[in-house]
Amino acid sequence: MYTNSHDIIRKPVITEKSMAEMADKKYTFIVDPHANKVQIKKAIEEVFGVKVEKVNTSNILGKTKRVGVHVGKRADYKKAIVKLTEDSKAIEFFEGMQ
């Protein structure tokens, strides 16, 4: 279904909460909604060259927004919180952000 690992990982989540979790080697990403935990784990290990201990996922429903009489909806997305093993190195992309 996926041609490569970059199709699964969409973008990192940079928030105050996700930055605090980086001390525990937990990194948060927006991922493809159809990807499962095994595919996400394989993609993170392949792209960043780290060892993943576990993956927690959650489907986030987009909020309903309105401007005047027009009603719209933000897109739904899937969020993955990836915990690395103790002996694994940190993901270089996030270094210097703490």
Swiss-Prot record:
Supply the alphabetized keyword list.
Ribonucleoprotein, Ribosomal protein, RNA-binding, rRNA-binding
Please provide one cellular component term from the Gene Ontology annotations of this protein. Answer: ribosome
Stored Pfam families: Ribosomal_L23
Record's subunit section: Part of the 50S ribosomal subunit. Contacts protein L29, and trigger factor when it is bound to the ribosome.
Q: What does this protein do?
A: One of the early assembly proteins it binds 23S rRNA. One of the proteins that surrounds the polypeptide exit tunnel on the outside of the ribosome. Forms the main docking site for trigger factor binding to the ribosome.
Annotated family: Belongs to the universal ribosomal protein uL23 family.
Q: Which NCBIfam families match?
A: PRK05738.2-4
Protein name from the UniProt record:
Large ribosomal subunit protein uL23
Organism name: Clostridium acetobutylicum (strain ATCC 824 / DSM 792 / JCM 1419 / IAM 19013 / LMG 5710 / NBRC 13948 / NRRL B-527 / VKM B-1787 / 2291 / W)
